[in-house]
Amino acid sequence: MKLKYKVILIINFVTVLFSIFTFIGYLNNLIGFRVVTISLCITIAMTVYLLYKKRKGFLLVYLIYLFLTNFGVFVTNIFLANPLVEYHGDLSWYYINTSNLFSIATFAILTFTILSNFISVFSKINPSRKFDIKSKGNNLFYYTGILFIIGFTIQFLFYIITGRLAINTYGDYVSSIQELPMYTYGIFFFSIGIAFAFSNVKKTHIKYLVIILTPQVLFFLITGNRGEVFYPILSALGVLIVRNYKIKWWMIITIVFTLFFVIPFIKVFRNMDSSSIEKVDINWFSSLVEIGYTLRPLGYVTRWIDGGESIVYGKSYLAPIQNIFSYIIPGLQPVNYEMVGYGFRYRLPGMGFNVIAEAYYNGAIVGVLIVMVLLVLLLWKFTNFKSFEMLSMGTAIVSVLINNIRNAFSFVPAYILIIIVIVIILLFIDSYLKKETKAD
């Protein structure tokens, strides 16, 4: 073992241990939240570096997004007494229950971080060498991915040109997509396309994928709909790391600049008139708090539980599976989400949801522990697939799981089932084409 790697492991171990002790101190009212937050930030940074070196790309990207979506507000709170200064309306979900929210979010992220470190250090299984980015994967999966990307881009432009999709403001955009059910499926296939393409692309061809993706990414950023960019791009970044693609410093700087300056500028510029351009005021924390606002559903869930509502012991995870089987098993009734406590989109309309909040609603802190453990094991398993075809499937599922960070679980089983069906169909086609080629 090289000396540099040993030093990294020691530093990483110390930061994890320090975060655990500071968190215990916080729970016993001995340490303030700022110390815990700073400690956790350092631990996350060291863990991300270790995961990158060990090519655990799926764990890496999931951890980053889990942290940003649940700790963006707390990180801002280190510097600002009121991190929600740009927000109005009912903010009691945060201010009344800040300590409880902080404890739950810290426990979840620290659990994920500790397990990721443990697997990275002690696991003897590493990504297959044949996945190296210098090699090209399955051609059928690669070109199917490109087809899905181009297909959704055409659909997106068609909706805009025909006036069915409004892009004047983010509010208009959200309202118009409610009337376009096929748009949601288009986005889903777009994310599958990105997963398939980057799982099988050769290093010298990455630039062509970037060219194909750039128009669509710009359209999403202009409309203010960043989610459709983050989920698939993060999964693509994850699989590139698994495939030993080297991330350059200029790439990291570009991402940070885009996140903290370009996107906030677009948001401000799109909501102002030409006479007030000189009054543009971009706050460094705007994007961080907006991403971290995903914490809000957890605030409501803890209020429900503290108010006497019972935890549901996994029912919200079983409900979508029951709904799938209700189509094929006579007499099995689908779950009516409007009639149950875990119909989150009806209880908190337009709010999205939160993976930690749903885990807490199902099993309190034990539920959070179980979900974090399962996620780490799943993401680790996807990293260790041995064929490009399975890696493609794993990357597509990772995109769904990243999407789930800011949404309820209800869509996840159906999306995973669709991905599996697509992969099976492509495997049959690929097998047939190879047989035909041999016959010729």
Curated annotation (Swiss-Prot):
Domain of life from the UniProt record: Bacteria
Principal location class: membrane
TM region(s), chain numbering: 7-27, 31-51, 60-80, 102-122, 141-161, 179-199, 204-224, 249-269, 324-344, 360-380, 382-402, 409-429
Membrane topology recorded in Swiss-Prot or TrEMBL: Multi-pass membrane protein
GO BP of this protein: capsule polysaccharide biosynthetic process
Pathway note: Capsule biogenesis; capsule polysaccharide biosynthesis
Name listed for the protein in its UniProt record: Protein CapE
Organism: Staphylococcus aureus
